[in-house]
Design a protein with these regions (language model features):
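Phosphate-group recognition and catalysis centered on beta-loop-alpha active-site segments
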Residues: 1-258
Length: 258
């Protein structure tokens, strides 16, 4: 099955500039969390459009493979939170059903729908939800991750690492697989995970904006780019930058943006 409306053998975007490396060199850099998911229903066209208009050059995307093989932009494993009154599990529900559901400002989007319309200078911070936060051993979830890797490789002309930043969490072991594919990896951490974390396995380190100065000092000492999450107003942004964050994962495009 082709994941894109284009011929699967034809790259959507040719390999070119390393957009990810250039993006991470900015101070500060901004990533739109869940495509503006606090101001707008998460992962919808409204939030995507608002994020791009606000000047974001990176979008954070959670994806899950649905029953018919498409990767759907959704954080949760089922639809009950984002579409009240429904209870579809993403993994065993086909896109033909999911596409009929409506959140407050529109329907769900597939990863292909997003890639088809974003400019070539946009970084996609992709979180493959079933493998990003644990030592996943389920063959189906690992196969879905492999399918996603292959799709991105074709879509971005053999060099997806130039457009995609791979997102994981402290307990996720997918970083090794992503690094083997050439990706830079961003890990989102919480204060109680810092002491036991090996920063060397990641390229970008995320932390709650409200974490104490001692926590941020440890992150900054790594010499790696850092990103504060989840920012929804100017006060939080200022505090995060004062603690040394080099990037902001912001979720309210009209208030916090580049």
């Amino acid at each position: 099955m082709s994941l894109s409306r284009r011929a699967p053998s034809t790259p959507v975007i040719p390999a070119g500039e390393d957009v990810v490396t250039a993006f991470l060199s900015r101070r500060p850099f901004y990533i739109s969390h869940r495509m503006g998911g606090t101001e707008f229903p998460e992962f919808t066209q409204a939030g995507l459009t608002a994020s791009l208009r606000a000047g974001f050059k990176a979008l954070e995307l959670s994806v899950r493979r649905c029953a018919s093989g498409e990767f759907v932009a959704i954080h949760d494993w089922k639809t009950s939170r984002t579409v009240p009154g429904t209870d579809y599990q993403i993994w065993n529900t086909p896109w033909s059903t999911l596409r009929t559901l409506r959140q407050a400002s529109g329907g769900f989007m597939r990863l292909t729908d997003i890639i088809d319309q974003v400019p070539d200078d946009i970084v996609l911070a992709i979180d493959h939800k079933t493998t990003s936060s644990e030592d996943q051993r389920n063959p189906g979830d690992l196969a879905a991750e492999e399918q996603l890797f292959d799709y991105l490789d074709t879509t971005f002309g053999g060099h997806p690492e130039r457009r995609v930043l791979w997102k994981v969490f402290a307990k996720g072991t997918g970083a090794k697989r992503a690094k083997a594919r050439g990706y830079k990896v961003m890990a989102m951490l919480y204060p109680n995970e810092v002491a036991t974390s090996d920063f060397s396995q990641w390229d970008v380190i995320g932390m709650e904006w409200s974490a104490g100065a001692d926590v941020w000092n440890r992150l900054n000492a790594s010499g790696k780019p850092t990103i504060a999450h989840i920012i929804v107003n100017d006060s939080q942004a200022r505090q995060a930058l004062a603690k040394g964050a080099t990037g902001l994962m912001a979720s309210y495009p009209s208030l916090v943006h580049p």
